[in-house]
């Protein structure tokens, strides 16, 4: 059975983030943010991809698996049940289903993939819903990585 990891960088530095990825044996980071930019240094798309490449890891942005704006607003307000409801509806869209198939193909090809988003707590993040949806497409074991806080 393939394994897929998840990680949130909310409380991490680039160093502790990459250490957690290395400890988890990650080879490719799949960015599941709708908008791959960040106020946290080193976590916007181009810089993140460069940091990962320096560490010997690949990067792919799966934008259509990102949370719609209304889901991000619900998450910021701590309305996690609403976020889950909005995101499940989003997962039913053709674009999200296609991106999920792309993710399944990547995971099925063999590299250890890690789903990336901001939220530190996987139970409050849509990446857990992505992992669950992936498990409906291909058999995967899900492991949540937790970078050290700094």
Write out the residue ranges for each language-model feature.
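Residues lining hydrophobic/aromatic ligand-binding pockets adjacent to catalytic sites
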Residues: 1-150
């Amino acid at each position: 059975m393939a394994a897929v990891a998840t990680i949130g960088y909310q409380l991490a530095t680039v160093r502790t983030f990459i250490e957690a990825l290395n400890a988890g044996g990650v080879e490719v980071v799949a960015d599941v943010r709708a908008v791959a930019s960040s106020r946290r240094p080193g976590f916007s798309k181009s810089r993140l991809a460069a940091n990962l490449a320096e560490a010997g890891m690949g990067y792919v942005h799966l934008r259509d698996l990102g949370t719609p704006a209304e889901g991000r607003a619900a998450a910021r307000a701590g309305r996690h049940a609403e976020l889950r409801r909005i995101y499940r509806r989003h997962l039913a869209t053709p674009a999200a289903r296609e991106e999920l198939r792309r993710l399944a193909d990547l995971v099925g090809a063999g590299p250890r993939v890690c789903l990336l988003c901001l939220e530190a707590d996987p139970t409050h993040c849509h990446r857990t819903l992505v992992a669950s949806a992936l498990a409906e497409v291909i058999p995967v074991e899900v492991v949540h990585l937790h970078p050290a806080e700094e």
